[in-house]
From Swiss-Prot:
The gene is astB. One of its GO terms (molecular function) is N-succinylarginine dihydrolase activity. This is N-succinylarginine dihydrolase. Its EC number is 3.5.3.23. HAMAP family: AstB. It comes from Zymomonas mobilis subsp. mobilis (strain ATCC 31821 / ZM4 / CP4). The active site is at E174, H242, C357 (nucleophile). SUPFAM superfamilies: Pentein (SSF55909).
Protein backbone atom coordinates (compact mmCIF):
# COMPACT_ATOMS: atom_id res chain seq x y z
CA UNK A 1 0.00 0.00 0.00
CA UNK A 2 1.46 3.34 -1.08
CA UNK A 3 0.77 6.05 1.50
CA UNK A 4 1.80 9.68 1.18
CA UNK A 5 0.95 12.91 2.92
CA UNK A 6 -1.06 15.41 0.89
CA UNK A 7 -0.98 19.08 1.87
CA UNK A 8 -4.20 21.02 1.40
CA UNK A 9 -3.44 24.75 1.50
CA UNK A 10 -6.02 27.42 2.16
CA UNK A 11 -6.34 29.92 -0.67
CA UNK A 12 -6.17 33.42 0.81
CA UNK A 13 -9.46 35.25 0.29
CA UNK A 14 -10.07 38.68 -1.29
CA UNK A 15 -10.89 40.40 2.03
CA UNK A 16 -7.49 39.59 3.59
CA UNK A 17 -6.81 42.45 6.01
CA UNK A 18 -5.00 43.48 9.17
CA UNK A 19 -7.72 44.32 11.66
CA UNK A 20 -5.77 42.97 14.64
CA UNK A 21 -8.48 40.57 15.81
CA UNK A 22 -6.32 37.83 17.30
CA UNK A 23 -5.34 38.35 20.94
CA UNK A 24 -2.12 36.52 21.76
CA UNK A 25 -0.94 36.67 18.15
CA UNK A 26 2.07 39.00 18.23
CA UNK A 27 2.22 39.60 14.47
CA UNK A 28 -1.51 40.33 14.26
CA UNK A 29 -1.21 43.01 16.94
CA UNK A 30 1.96 44.48 15.45
CA UNK A 31 0.45 44.98 11.98
CA UNK A 32 -3.07 46.00 13.04
CA UNK A 33 -4.40 48.88 10.95
CA UNK A 34 -1.83 48.57 8.19
CA UNK A 35 -2.77 48.17 4.50
CA UNK A 36 -2.96 44.61 3.20
CA UNK A 37 -2.48 43.27 -0.31
CA UNK A 38 -4.98 40.45 -0.91
CA UNK A 39 -3.90 39.73 -4.48
CA UNK A 40 -0.27 39.49 -3.51
CA UNK A 41 -1.19 37.38 -0.48
CA UNK A 42 -3.12 34.82 -2.53
CA UNK A 43 -0.43 34.66 -5.20
CA UNK A 44 2.24 34.12 -2.54
CA UNK A 45 0.20 31.21 -1.21
CA UNK A 46 -0.18 29.75 -4.69
CA UNK A 47 3.54 30.07 -5.32
CA UNK A 48 4.18 28.09 -2.14
CA UNK A 49 1.83 25.38 -3.38
CA UNK A 50 3.68 25.32 -6.70
CA UNK A 51 7.01 24.85 -4.91
CA UNK A 52 5.70 21.63 -3.39
CA UNK A 53 4.21 20.47 -6.68
CA UNK A 54 7.57 21.05 -8.37
CA UNK A 55 9.18 18.88 -5.68
CA UNK A 56 6.96 15.99 -6.80
CA UNK A 57 4.41 16.25 -3.98
CA UNK A 58 0.64 16.03 -4.32
CA UNK A 59 -0.94 19.39 -3.49
CA UNK A 60 -4.56 20.16 -2.65
CA UNK A 61 -6.39 23.43 -2.08
CA UNK A 62 -9.23 24.68 0.13
CA UNK A 63 -11.32 27.55 -1.20
CA UNK A 64 -12.16 30.56 0.99
CA UNK A 65 -15.75 31.11 2.16
CA UNK A 66 -17.61 34.24 1.10
CA UNK A 67 -16.91 37.28 3.24
CA UNK A 68 -18.33 39.39 4.83
CA UNK A 69 -20.52 36.90 6.70
CA UNK A 70 -24.20 37.88 6.72
CA UNK A 71 -26.02 34.94 8.31
CA UNK A 72 -24.80 35.90 11.79
CA UNK A 73 -26.35 39.34 11.44
CA UNK A 74 -29.74 37.80 10.71
CA UNK A 75 -29.37 35.72 13.89
CA UNK A 76 -28.57 38.94 15.75
CA UNK A 77 -31.81 40.56 14.64
CA UNK A 78 -30.74 42.65 11.65
CA UNK A 79 -33.42 43.00 8.98
CA UNK A 80 -33.07 43.61 5.26
CA UNK A 81 -30.96 42.49 2.34
CA UNK A 82 -27.24 41.80 2.68
CA UNK A 83 -26.15 45.29 1.70
CA UNK A 84 -28.56 46.92 4.15
CA UNK A 85 -27.61 44.83 7.16
CA UNK A 86 -23.88 45.06 6.45
CA UNK A 87 -24.09 48.84 6.30
CA UNK A 88 -26.01 48.94 9.55
CA UNK A 89 -23.65 46.53 11.31
CA UNK A 90 -20.62 48.53 10.18
CA UNK A 91 -22.23 51.63 11.68
CA UNK A 92 -23.43 49.97 14.90
CA UNK A 93 -20.50 47.77 15.87
CA UNK A 94 -17.27 48.11 13.92
CA UNK A 95 -15.44 45.40 15.84
CA UNK A 96 -18.19 42.89 15.12
CA UNK A 97 -18.18 43.93 11.48
CA UNK A 98 -14.42 43.45 11.19
CA UNK A 99 -14.87 39.91 12.49
CA UNK A 100 -17.36 39.25 9.69
CA UNK A 101 -14.76 40.22 7.07
CA UNK A 102 -11.84 38.08 8.24
CA UNK A 103 -10.03 35.91 5.69
CA UNK A 104 -8.53 33.73 8.42
CA UNK A 105 -9.76 30.48 6.83
CA UNK A 106 -6.48 30.67 4.86
CA UNK A 107 -4.82 28.96 7.83
CA UNK A 108 -5.89 25.45 6.99
CA UNK A 109 -3.91 23.96 9.88
CA UNK A 110 -6.83 25.10 12.05
CA UNK A 111 -9.50 23.54 9.84
CA UNK A 112 -9.54 20.14 11.52
CA UNK A 113 -7.56 17.42 13.23
CA UNK A 114 -6.80 14.53 10.89
CA UNK A 115 -6.40 10.99 12.22
CA UNK A 116 -4.62 8.49 9.98
CA UNK A 117 -6.37 5.29 8.95
CA UNK A 118 -3.51 3.40 10.64
CA UNK A 119 -4.29 4.92 14.02
CA UNK A 120 -8.11 4.68 14.05
CA UNK A 121 -10.14 1.67 15.15
CA UNK A 122 -12.23 1.51 11.98
CA UNK A 123 -9.34 1.95 9.54
CA UNK A 124 -10.68 5.19 8.05
CA UNK A 125 -9.18 8.67 7.92
CA UNK A 126 -11.05 10.81 10.45
CA UNK A 127 -11.56 14.56 10.20
CA UNK A 128 -12.67 16.35 13.37
CA UNK A 129 -13.59 19.88 12.33
CA UNK A 130 -12.21 22.48 14.74
CA UNK A 131 -14.71 24.72 16.53
CA UNK A 132 -12.18 27.59 16.90
CA UNK A 133 -14.24 28.76 19.85
CA UNK A 134 -11.71 31.17 21.36
CA UNK A 135 -11.95 33.82 18.63
CA UNK A 136 -15.20 34.90 16.95
CA UNK A 137 -13.64 35.56 13.55
CA UNK A 138 -12.23 32.02 13.54
CA UNK A 139 -15.36 30.37 14.93
CA UNK A 140 -17.35 31.77 12.01
CA UNK A 141 -15.37 29.44 9.74
CA UNK A 142 -16.31 26.20 11.45
CA UNK A 143 -19.51 25.22 9.65
CA UNK A 144 -18.33 26.21 6.15
CA UNK A 145 -15.10 24.32 6.81
CA UNK A 146 -17.09 21.23 7.78
CA UNK A 147 -19.15 21.52 4.60
CA UNK A 148 -16.07 21.85 2.39
CA UNK A 149 -14.28 18.94 4.05
CA UNK A 150 -17.42 16.84 3.65
CA UNK A 151 -17.48 17.74 -0.03
CA UNK A 152 -13.83 16.86 -0.64
CA UNK A 153 -13.72 13.70 1.48
CA UNK A 154 -17.26 12.43 0.93
CA UNK A 155 -16.55 8.73 0.39
CA UNK A 156 -17.51 7.13 3.70
CA UNK A 157 -15.64 3.94 2.84
CA UNK A 158 -12.39 5.83 3.35
CA UNK A 159 -13.29 8.93 5.37
CA UNK A 160 -15.23 9.78 8.54
CA UNK A 161 -16.31 13.39 8.98
CA UNK A 162 -17.11 14.91 12.37
CA UNK A 163 -18.86 18.16 13.23
CA UNK A 164 -17.06 20.70 15.44
CA UNK A 165 -17.18 20.17 19.20
CA UNK A 166 -19.78 22.16 21.15
CA UNK A 167 -18.97 25.84 21.23
CA UNK A 168 -17.54 27.44 24.33
CA UNK A 169 -14.04 27.78 25.70
CA UNK A 170 -14.44 24.61 27.79
CA UNK A 171 -14.07 22.76 24.47
CA UNK A 172 -11.85 25.19 22.60
CA UNK A 173 -10.26 23.27 19.73
CA UNK A 174 -7.96 24.73 17.10
CA UNK A 175 -7.30 21.68 14.99
CA UNK A 176 -4.10 20.27 13.55
CA UNK A 177 -2.02 23.25 14.69
CA UNK A 178 -1.99 21.48 18.08
CA UNK A 179 -1.62 17.91 16.81
CA UNK A 180 1.47 16.03 15.68
CA UNK A 181 1.82 12.50 14.40
CA UNK A 182 5.14 10.74 14.98
CA UNK A 183 5.65 7.46 13.15
CA UNK A 184 8.39 5.45 11.48
CA UNK A 185 6.60 6.06 8.15
CA UNK A 186 3.33 7.61 6.93
CA UNK A 187 2.01 4.13 6.14
CA UNK A 188 2.52 2.75 9.63
CA UNK A 189 0.93 3.16 13.03
CA UNK A 190 2.07 6.27 14.89
CA UNK A 191 1.70 8.27 18.08
CA UNK A 192 -0.84 11.09 17.97
CA UNK A 193 0.42 13.92 20.16
CA UNK A 194 -2.29 16.33 21.25
CA UNK A 195 -0.76 19.51 22.66
CA UNK A 196 -2.98 21.56 24.95
CA UNK A 197 -2.59 24.84 26.79
CA UNK A 198 -3.10 25.41 30.48
CA UNK A 199 -4.25 28.62 32.16
CA UNK A 200 -2.04 31.58 31.27
CA UNK A 201 -2.19 35.03 32.81
CA UNK A 202 -1.18 36.90 29.65
CA UNK A 203 -2.76 35.26 26.60
CA UNK A 204 -5.57 32.72 26.21
CA UNK A 205 -4.66 29.06 25.82
CA UNK A 206 -6.62 28.12 22.72
CA UNK A 207 -6.53 24.33 22.98
CA UNK A 208 -8.18 22.75 26.02
CA UNK A 209 -7.29 19.30 27.30
CA UNK A 210 -10.91 18.13 27.36
CA UNK A 211 -11.24 19.23 23.72
CA UNK A 212 -8.17 17.24 22.72
CA UNK A 213 -9.49 14.22 24.59
CA UNK A 214 -12.83 14.50 22.78
CA UNK A 215 -11.06 14.81 19.42
CA UNK A 216 -9.13 11.61 20.14
CA UNK A 217 -12.35 9.79 21.04
CA UNK A 218 -14.18 11.01 17.95
CA UNK A 219 -11.25 10.04 15.75
CA UNK A 220 -11.31 6.56 17.31
CA UNK A 221 -7.62 6.82 18.11
CA UNK A 222 -6.40 3.64 19.73
CA UNK A 223 -5.85 4.50 23.42
CA UNK A 224 -2.13 3.72 23.47
CA UNK A 225 -1.61 6.00 20.45
CA UNK A 226 -3.18 9.15 21.96
CA UNK A 227 -0.75 11.19 24.05
CA UNK A 228 -1.68 14.50 25.68
CA UNK A 229 1.21 16.89 26.29
CA UNK A 230 0.92 20.37 27.87
CA UNK A 231 2.46 23.27 25.99
CA UNK A 232 4.96 25.20 28.07
CA UNK A 233 3.31 28.23 29.67
CA UNK A 234 6.27 30.44 28.82
CA UNK A 235 5.83 29.61 25.13
CA UNK A 236 2.20 30.74 25.19
CA UNK A 237 3.18 33.90 27.09
CA UNK A 238 5.76 34.75 24.41
CA UNK A 239 3.19 34.46 21.62
CA UNK A 240 3.18 30.77 20.67
CA UNK A 241 -0.60 30.69 20.50
CA UNK A 242 -0.49 27.30 18.74
CA UNK A 243 1.93 24.43 19.20
CA UNK A 244 3.02 24.71 15.56
CA UNK A 245 4.75 28.00 16.40
CA UNK A 246 7.32 26.09 18.50
CA UNK A 247 7.30 22.52 17.14
CA UNK A 248 6.78 20.55 13.94
CA UNK A 249 7.01 16.81 13.24
CA UNK A 250 7.21 14.67 10.13
CA UNK A 251 7.28 10.88 10.29
CA UNK A 252 10.07 10.04 12.79
CA UNK A 253 11.56 13.56 13.02
CA UNK A 254 10.57 16.15 15.63
CA UNK A 255 11.89 19.71 15.29
CA UNK A 256 11.11 21.68 18.44
CA UNK A 257 12.26 24.57 20.56
CA UNK A 258 13.77 23.54 23.88
CA UNK A 259 10.88 25.27 25.68
CA UNK A 260 8.00 23.92 23.60
CA UNK A 261 6.49 21.52 26.16
CA UNK A 262 6.28 21.02 29.89
CA UNK A 263 8.53 18.15 31.08
CA UNK A 264 9.98 18.07 27.58
CA UNK A 265 12.91 15.77 28.32
CA UNK A 266 10.65 13.09 29.77
CA UNK A 267 8.28 13.21 26.79
CA UNK A 268 11.17 12.97 24.32
CA UNK A 269 12.42 9.91 26.17
CA UNK A 270 9.00 8.25 26.04
CA UNK A 271 8.61 8.91 22.31
CA UNK A 272 12.05 7.41 21.65
CA UNK A 273 11.00 4.26 23.50
CA UNK A 274 7.88 3.95 21.34
CA UNK A 275 9.06 4.93 17.82
CA UNK A 276 11.95 3.12 16.16
CA UNK A 277 14.51 5.50 14.69
CA UNK A 278 12.99 8.59 16.34
CA UNK A 279 15.12 11.69 15.71
CA UNK A 280 14.46 14.71 17.96
CA UNK A 281 16.05 17.98 16.80
CA UNK A 282 15.80 20.23 19.84
CA UNK A 283 16.83 23.86 19.33
CA UNK A 284 18.17 25.69 22.39
CA UNK A 285 20.37 28.39 20.85
CA UNK A 286 17.57 30.82 19.99
CA UNK A 287 15.04 32.39 22.34
CA UNK A 288 11.30 31.91 22.26
CA UNK A 289 11.04 35.50 21.05
CA UNK A 290 13.29 34.68 18.09
CA UNK A 291 11.28 31.56 17.36
CA UNK A 292 8.00 33.50 17.33
CA UNK A 293 9.38 36.36 15.23
CA UNK A 294 11.05 34.16 12.62
CA UNK A 295 8.48 31.32 12.64
CA UNK A 296 11.31 28.82 12.23
CA UNK A 297 9.13 26.08 13.71
CA UNK A 298 6.10 27.06 11.65
CA UNK A 299 7.84 25.39 8.74
CA UNK A 300 6.66 22.40 6.80
CA UNK A 301 8.77 19.27 6.87
CA UNK A 302 7.97 17.09 3.86
CA UNK A 303 9.23 13.69 2.78
CA UNK A 304 10.58 13.62 -0.77
CA UNK A 305 10.56 10.69 -3.17
CA UNK A 306 14.17 9.79 -2.35
CA UNK A 307 13.12 9.52 1.34
CA UNK A 308 15.09 12.60 2.37
CA UNK A 309 13.16 15.49 3.88
CA UNK A 310 12.88 19.18 3.04
CA UNK A 311 12.15 22.13 5.30
CA UNK A 312 9.76 24.73 3.82
CA UNK A 313 10.55 27.99 5.63
CA UNK A 314 9.31 31.59 5.62
CA UNK A 315 11.86 34.07 4.32
CA UNK A 316 11.86 35.78 7.73
CA UNK A 317 14.28 33.10 8.98
CA UNK A 318 17.00 34.89 7.00
CA UNK A 319 16.45 38.15 8.89
CA UNK A 320 17.97 36.78 12.10
CA UNK A 321 21.56 35.48 11.66
CA UNK A 322 21.22 33.10 14.62
CA UNK A 323 18.05 31.57 13.18
CA UNK A 324 19.54 31.21 9.70
CA UNK A 325 22.65 29.60 11.21
CA UNK A 326 20.31 27.18 12.97
CA UNK A 327 18.66 26.28 9.66
CA UNK A 328 22.05 25.52 8.13
CA UNK A 329 22.99 23.41 11.14
CA UNK A 330 19.79 21.41 10.74
CA UNK A 331 20.26 20.59 7.05
CA UNK A 332 23.94 19.69 7.55
CA UNK A 333 23.26 17.60 10.64
CA UNK A 334 22.83 13.88 11.17
CA UNK A 335 19.15 13.76 10.25
CA UNK A 336 17.09 13.28 7.06
CA UNK A 337 16.38 17.01 6.53
CA UNK A 338 18.75 17.82 3.68
CA UNK A 339 17.09 20.73 1.91
CA UNK A 340 15.84 24.17 2.98
CA UNK A 341 13.30 25.86 0.72
CA UNK A 342 12.62 29.50 1.60
CA UNK A 343 9.24 30.88 0.50
CA UNK A 344 7.71 34.35 0.51
CA UNK A 345 4.46 34.35 2.49
CA UNK A 346 4.91 37.82 3.99
CA UNK A 347 1.24 38.79 3.78
CA UNK A 348 0.23 35.75 5.82
CA UNK A 349 3.19 36.15 8.18
CA UNK A 350 2.13 39.70 9.01
CA UNK A 351 -1.08 38.22 10.42
CA UNK A 352 0.73 35.45 12.29
CA UNK A 353 0.64 32.57 9.82
CA UNK A 354 3.69 30.86 8.33
CA UNK A 355 3.99 27.98 5.84
CA UNK A 356 2.71 25.38 8.31
CA UNK A 357 -0.34 27.46 9.22
CA UNK A 358 -1.41 27.58 5.59
CA UNK A 359 -1.77 23.83 5.14
CA UNK A 360 -3.68 20.83 6.49
CA UNK A 361 -1.74 17.57 6.32
CA UNK A 362 -3.74 14.52 5.20
CA UNK A 363 -2.06 11.08 5.07
CA UNK A 364 -3.68 9.11 2.24
CA UNK A 365 -3.25 5.70 0.70
CA UNK A 366 -3.35 5.51 -3.08
CA UNK A 367 -6.95 4.24 -2.96
CA UNK A 368 -8.02 6.96 -0.51
CA UNK A 369 -6.42 9.65 -2.67
CA UNK A 370 -8.40 8.40 -5.66
CA UNK A 371 -11.57 8.75 -3.52
CA UNK A 372 -10.87 12.45 -2.90
CA UNK A 373 -12.82 14.98 -4.99
CA UNK A 374 -10.17 15.56 -7.65
CA UNK A 375 -11.34 19.11 -8.33
CA UNK A 376 -9.49 20.10 -5.14
CA UNK A 377 -6.21 18.47 -6.22
CA UNK A 378 -4.00 20.86 -8.14
CA UNK A 379 -2.48 20.04 -11.51
CA UNK A 380 -0.18 22.47 -13.33
CA UNK A 381 -3.06 23.47 -15.61
CA UNK A 382 -5.55 24.01 -12.79
CA UNK A 383 -2.93 25.89 -10.79
CA UNK A 384 -2.35 28.26 -13.72
CA UNK A 385 -6.08 28.92 -14.09
CA UNK A 386 -6.41 29.59 -10.37
CA UNK A 387 -3.42 31.94 -10.45
CA UNK A 388 -4.98 33.87 -13.33
CA UNK A 389 -8.32 34.00 -11.52
CA UNK A 390 -6.68 35.62 -8.49
CA UNK A 391 -4.91 38.16 -10.69
CA UNK A 392 -8.24 39.08 -12.28
CA UNK A 393 -10.57 39.19 -9.27
CA UNK A 394 -8.61 39.89 -6.06
CA UNK A 395 -8.21 43.54 -4.97
CA UNK A 396 -4.67 44.84 -5.03
CA UNK A 397 -4.76 46.76 -1.74
CA UNK A 398 -7.19 47.38 1.09
CA UNK A 399 -7.09 49.01 4.51
CA UNK A 400 -9.30 48.11 7.47
CA UNK A 401 -11.37 51.21 6.67
CA UNK A 402 -12.07 49.81 3.19
CA UNK A 403 -13.91 46.85 4.71
CA UNK A 404 -17.09 48.95 5.07
CA UNK A 405 -17.19 49.86 1.36
CA UNK A 406 -19.97 48.13 -0.63
CA UNK A 407 -17.69 47.99 -3.67
CA UNK A 408 -15.34 45.69 -1.77
CA UNK A 409 -18.27 43.42 -0.90
CA UNK A 410 -19.18 43.25 -4.58
CA UNK A 411 -15.59 42.40 -5.45
CA UNK A 412 -15.64 39.57 -2.92
CA UNK A 413 -18.87 38.20 -4.39
CA UNK A 414 -17.44 38.29 -7.92
CA UNK A 415 -14.34 36.45 -6.72
CA UNK A 416 -16.52 33.86 -4.98
CA UNK A 417 -18.47 33.11 -8.14
CA UNK A 418 -15.26 32.95 -10.17
CA UNK A 419 -13.97 30.29 -7.77
CA UNK A 420 -17.25 28.40 -8.08
CA UNK A 421 -16.82 28.41 -11.86
CA UNK A 422 -13.17 27.29 -11.56
CA UNK A 423 -14.24 24.38 -9.37
CA UNK A 424 -16.68 23.25 -12.05
Amino acid sequence: MIVSEVNFDGLIGPTHNYAGLSRGNVASALHAGQPSYPRQAALQGLEKMKHLMDMGLTQGVFLPPLRPVTHLLHHLGYKGDDKTILKQAAKDDRLLFNNLCSASSMWAANAATVISEFDSHDGRVHFITANLATMLHRHLEAQTTYAQLNQIFSNSCFFAMHHPLPCGQHFSDEGAANHMRITSAHGRTGINIFVYGEKNDIYPARQKLRASQAVARLGEVKPDLAWFIPQKKEAIAKGAFHNDVVAVANEYVLLAHAEAFEDQGEWIKRIAEKIDGFIPIIIDNITLEQAVKSYLFNSQIVTLKDRTMALILPQEVKSDPAVWETVNRIISGNNPIKKAVVVDVRESMANGGGPACLRLRVPLSKAALEAVDQRFILTPKRWEKLYQLVENFWPEKITPDDLVLPELWKTAVRAHWALTSWLG
